[in-house]
């Protein structure tokens, strides 16, 4: 039986925080549906005046949902051997997604680049997962930043 470290609790809290962020974005879409009168099941507005703003709010949420499963996978797996690093990167991803969404909400899609931190953090989580796999396979003896045989 494998035992997770006590520090894996940070990973669990980060996963819970990410759900709160996704729920916040969903609430914003719900409010925008009422404000811009976009009924279910219509995904996008065709209103020439305000439809663009609603569509940006909707896309910010949808794009986050598109990347959410890989985020959770890399957070959970990368956190097995590197819980603090994975949690820090996970929090950076959450902040990045909020910045991305609020940049997108302006109606100027180019402002979503404010959330680039999230993409960088996700790449870091991929790295922690690969490093964890190397450690688990015994290809390296220690983890990130732990001496001459760390995952670089």
Swiss-Prot record:
Residues assigned to the Mitochondrial intermembrane compartment are 1-8, 92-119
Q: List the EC numbers from the record.
A: 2.5.1.-, 1.11.1.-, 4.4.1.20
InterPro entries hit by this protein: MAPEG (IPR050997), MAPEG-like_dom_sf (IPR023352), Membr-assoc_MAPEG (IPR001129)
Where does this protein act, in terms of pathway? Lipid metabolism; leukotriene C4 biosynthesis; Lipid metabolism; arachidonate metabolism
**Tissues in which the protein is found:** Predominantly expressed in heart, skeletal muscle, and adrenal cortex. Also found in brain, placenta, liver, kidney, pancreas, thyroid, testis and ovary. Almost absent in lung, thymus and peripheral blood leukocytes. Expressed in mast cells.
Keyword Nucleus in the entry? The reply is no
Recall the GO molecular function terms of this protein's record. glutathione peroxidase activity; glutathione transferase activity; identical protein binding; leukotriene-C4 synthase activity
Q: What is the protein's membrane topology class?
A: Multi-pass membrane protein
Q: Set out the biological process GO terms recorded for this chain's protein.
A: arachidonate metabolic process; leukotriene biosynthetic process; lipid metabolic process; prostanoid metabolic process
Q: State which residue ranges cross the membrane.
A: 9-29, 71-91, 120-140
Query: Where would you find this protein in the cell?
Result: Mitochondrion outer membrane
Give the residues carrying a lipid (S-palmitoyl cysteine). Answer: 150-151
Q: Which UniProt keywords apply?
A: Lipid metabolism, Lipoprotein, Lyase, Membrane, Mitochondrion, Mitochondrion outer membrane, Oxidoreductase, Palmitate, Transferase, Transmembrane, Transmembrane helix
SUPFAM superfamilies noted in UniProt = MAPEG domain-like
What GO cellular component term, any one, is given?
Answer: endoplasmic reticulum membrane
Residues exposed to the Cytoplasmic side: 30-70, 141-152
Q: Which reaction does it catalyse?
A: leukotriene C4 = leukotriene A4 + glutathione; 15-deoxy-Delta(12,14)-prostaglandin J2 + glutathione = 15-deoxy-Delta(12,14)-prostaglandin J2-S-(R)-glutathione; (5S)-hydroperoxy-(6E,8Z,11Z,14Z)-eicosatetraenoate + 2 glutathione = (5S)-hydroxy-(6E,8Z,11Z,14Z)-eicosatetraenoate + glutathione disulfide + H2O
**Transferase as a keyword?**
yes
By sequence similarity, the record places it as follows: Belongs to the MAPEG family.
User: Which function does this protein serve?
Assistant: Displays both glutathione S-transferase and glutathione peroxidase activities toward oxyeicosanoids, as part of cellular detoxification as well as synthesis of bioactive metabolites. Catalyzes conjugate addition of reduced glutathione to the alpha, beta-unsaturated C=C carbonyl group of eisosanoids such as leukotriene A4 and 15-deoxy-Delta12,14-prostaglandin J2 to form GSH adducts relevant to the inflammatory response. Catalyzes glutathione-dependent reduction of eicosanoid peroxides to yield the corresponding eicosanoid hydroxides.
> What is the protein name given in its UniProt record?
Glutathione S-transferase 3, mitochondrial
Query: To which species is this protein native?
Result: Homo sapiens (Human)
Q: Which gene encodes it?
A: MGST3
